[in-house]
Design a protein with these regions (language model features):
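Conserved catalytic-core motifs of GNAT/GCN5-like acyltransferases
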Residues: 33-41
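Glyoxalase I/VOC metalloenzyme domain signal
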Residues: 2-9, 14-33, 52-111, 118-283
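Conserved beta-strand edge residues that scaffold enzyme active sites
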Residues: 40, 113-114
Length: 283
């Protein structure tokens, strides 16, 4: 039975070494970014968000070393890119108990916040309560956690949801794995969602509700899907990229010569987006 207090993908976390430099990189790709946020001291992190509907992309950097950001620092020692993926939690405390009954020792719930300057100048707070599956449980090399938004109106701000590149929502998260079926089965157990075998040996795992799916495939299979895109910087195991539903006419204009046509998609190679392949497809 699927988890009751955890629904589909909420956001993806792109770990970056230089937060402000990364923000400029993603602005050049045609994204609208939130003002820079600083999380509660025990988190030791700062971020920019790229708000879509109903999900988003978070650029996250470590500002101060803390116990809670040790896994993120270990990831950054190797590379940049998507380090973890959040599910939407209806109730983080109840969700943590749900996974406990399934044999996973949750980390948290953890409460934190960050100040938000609203478009009208008011200074408010975005408040969250999260819990994580155990760090060792990382299907496809990616950690997963769940995020309960206590103040959605300070996160999904309409002015931040309009992007020059036409981006609208996440459609798929691409996870490279030498053994896609094994990694997909791991995630399926963790979230109680059945995988769907594809003809080429890749596996789709729905995240829940109408949210983006996970697609597990080998790096070789990924290369066959996007043959004209340089993928050498991507790992053999880990999150390779994001498929984003968009207005492709706007995408083409925003990316210009930096966009690579591949079939019906327009791609930004990992080298241009902090180690994350971006695949824009028609919304």
């Amino acid at each position: 039975m699927a988890l009751k207090n955890v629904i589909g993908i909420d956001h993806v976390v792109v770990m970056v070494r230089d937060l402000d430099e990364a923000a400029e990189t993603w602005k050049r790709l045609g994204f609208t970014l939130s003002p820079r946020g600083t999380h509660s001291a025990h988190m030791g992190s700062g971020n920019y968000t790229i708000m879509l509907d109903p999900d988003y992309i978070e650029l996250l950097g470590v500002l101060t070393e803390t116990e809670l950001n040790a896994p993120a620092r270990a990831f950054l020692a190797k590379r940049e890119g998507v380090e973890r993926i959040a599910f939407t939690a209806i109730d983080s405390a109840a969700g943590a108990e749900e996974i406990r009954t399934r044999g996973y020792q949750p980390i948290g719930p953890t409460d934190f916040e960050r100040p938000v300057t609203m478009p009208d100048g008011r200074l408010l707070a975005a408040r969250f309560r999260t819990f994580q599956w155990p760090v060792a449980e990382a299907p496809g090399g990616v950690r997963i956690f769940a995020c309960q938004h206590k103040t959605r109106d300070t996160v999904w701000i309409p002015e931040l949801m309009k992007h020059a590149n036409g981006a609208r929502r996440l459609k798929q998260v691409l996870l490279a794995a030498p053994e896609p079926a094994k990694e997909a089965a791991h995630l399926s157990r963790m979230i109680d969602r059945k995988g769907q075998d594809q003809l080429d040996g890749s596996v789709i795992v729905p995240s829940g509700s109408d949210r983006a799916d996970f697609l597990f495939l080998t790096k070789e299979q990924l290369g066959r899907r996007y043959p004209d895109v340089p993928l050498s910087r991507l790992p053999e195991r880990g999150c390779a990229g994001l498929v984003i539903a968009a207005d492709l006419a706007a995408t083409e204009t925003a990316l210009g010569s930096g966009g690579i046509r591949s079939g019906g998609a327009i791609c930004a190679p990992p080298a241009s987006s902090n180690g994350t392949l971006l695949v824009f497809v028609s919304a």
